[in-house]
């Protein structure tokens, strides 16, 4: 078990390479053109800033400068 204490980082690298290869393999399986052709419509974005839109602090354009 002395080798495990010395070379644990190699096992981590092998694990990360395996994860990376599986991700690449899975991403190649995705057909993005088919998804984009059949993607669902998104509902309109609702934010809660709509009540603040009326409270505009910017000066009006038609007001003369003081």
Swiss-Prot record:
**Where found, per UniProt?**
Cell membrane
The membrane topology of this protein is:
Single-pass membrane protein
Could you list the residue ranges that cross the membrane? 4-24
Looking up InterPro entries in the UniProt record yields: UPF0370
What name appears for this protein in its UniProt entry?
Answer: UPF0370 protein YpfN
Native organism is Salmonella typhimurium (strain LT2 / SGSC1412 / ATCC 700720)
Q: Which gene encodes it?
A: ypfN
Give the domain of life: Bacteria
Q: Which Pfam families match?
A: UPF0370
- UniProt keyword list: Cell membrane, Membrane, Transmembrane, Transmembrane helix
Q: Where is this region: Disordered?
A: 39-66
The yes or no answer to whether the keyword Glycoprotein is present is: no
* SS bond partners: none
Q: Which family does it belong to?
A: Belongs to the UPF0370 family.
Q: Where is the composition biased (Basic and acidic residues)?
A: 42-51
Per the record, its GO cellular-component terms are: plasma membrane
Using the UniProt record, give the first listed, main subcellular location. Answer: membrane
């Amino acid at each position: 078990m002395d080798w495990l204490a010395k070379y644990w980082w190699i096992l981590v690298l092998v694990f990360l390479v395996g994860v990376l290869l599986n991700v690449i393999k899975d991403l190649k399986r995705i057909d993005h053109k088919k998804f984009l052709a059949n993607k669902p419509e998104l509902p309109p974005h609702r934010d809660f800033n709509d009540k603040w839109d009326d409270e505009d602090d910017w000066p009006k354009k038609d007001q003369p400068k003081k």
